[in-house]
Amino acid sequence: YDKENDTHINPYSDQAFYYITYGGDPGLRISPLNEPTGPGDAITTFNDYQFHEVDDFSPAKVGRRWFGNRFDIQDDQSYAFEFPNIVIGSDVEVNINVASASESATSMAVSLNGTAIDPINFGTISGSTLLSYRPSSQNSAPYIVPASGETVTVNLLYNNGSNPSSIGYLDYIRVGAVRQLIAGSEQFSFRYNLAATNFGIGEYSIASASQISQVWDVTNTTAIAAKANNESLNTLTFKAELGSLREYVAVSPQDYYTPVSVSDSGVQNQNIKGTIFKGEDGNFQDIDYLIITAPFLLQPAQRLAQYHIAQRGLKVKVVTLDKIYQEFSSGKQDIGAIRNLVRYIYENASAPENRIKYVGILGDSSIDYKNRLPGNNMVVPTFHTLFSSSTWTSYMSDDFFGMMGADPSNGNDEGLMGSNEKVDVAFGRILADDVTLANAMIDKIVNYEKQASYGNWRNNIIMVSDDVDIDWEFNKLQVTLNELSDRITLEKPFVNVKKIYMDAYEQQTSAGGNRYPDVNAALKNDIEVGALIVNYFGHGGEDGLAQEFIVDKDMASTLFHPGKYPLFITVTCEFSRFDNHTRPTAGEMLYQNPTGGAI
């Protein structure tokens, strides 16, 4: 179980890889268990847990929390967990995390071993809330029932609130129980939770242990120690200091796990750490700009790198994801590997002033790290929050990769996405999932920077404000934008600030709802004339800006102003989210327009 991700399943990969090599220095070895001397308190039980968790559905299409079993057609489902040699009468702890998508009030009835306990009640969904998520007992505390047998049965019955469109979802069930420390012919893991709070020496006693060859202390996976059962004793004992929680594995030669060799498992020698700072002459060279991409986009990535080397004199390196994963995450997909590469480059510059400044990601992204969704276009992963029930609380961001420094408030390294953290390296992303689109977006960059594209239009800034529907919006939207516009005019008098405040225009009613046709026309004209920046404050969604759609998908994809591409700054909601390939956004279309839209 991973507390940070609140899951028993790795969110990024279903496989773990280990490298096997030979020659060179000896690797780590398992050392004999160092047992304390003196009498010990007998420990004959251990804490075991099991879970049921399947990641098949992302109901809200936001965040990194996925769900398994659906409760719609089959609203009554049971799950059985077996605990051999359970201690009868001991506490069984059950955590149940579930969710509901319904515009009506719904609930989940829960019973453990046939005994009904408090139901889980869900709120309704509306607006930005797309899912009502509830951990067990409403506050993450486990249900506790006495053990009555070796089988623990959890039954869930979803009440859809008389709304046939309601759907319930199971995140996971986790069951913890106390078992007698009795072995068999299979290997098993064990821990004794009270060891963390007790003091002195504990003496573990494993019964029926004749087929157990060793017990490994795996608390520290880089310093494993073993207690051997060379004489095949039926009762195997060993001692350990109490005061901390320790993890053990009882090893049975009859139940060794067999590693699987994946197809094309050979890994070519590589050494990013040893070569990333080498220039063409073989000498040390700091890096200004790193481009990260997938192997199939290597050609356009190298083209972009060569352009910045030739035009800007930047020191640029291109690294593909497969190489990053091989060196920084043992071959599996993990967003931490990308950040660790950037941090390695950042920390090993010749001087602080020579640290890496820019990272460009060439490749689209998706909420689906594991390619479960048909047509998924995951190229380079991004960071997603654990919050997965609302577009208000969930977000994705590449900032995670660029937070390099130490957080002075808690002494921890940055990268936890806290509000007090700052980005130390500038990140950008080219949204492309094939070579053609990647090259088209690079063409856009090249054309934007050509001398022929320069002109007075780069002195123009367009400031756009949503209309005011609620009193507080006046200060937040129009007053704030007006103050910003006046400050720009004062400090940069050569800049032409064009204000487009929707409330200054006539609102019209159409079959599709309220609209501002004059705002659409003015904004389209000003963009095509040319503007360095378009700054928008207000509401927005995947289909456009403002409820009146002053920029919609059609406008975003048909704007035509080659070379004169503005930087769009939108202080709004999910206008430019790019992680759901089943619903392209207006912001994506604005960016991917090859002859217009945003740079």
Residue ranges of each PLM-predicted region?
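Cysteine-dependent hydrolase recognition
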Residues: 1-599
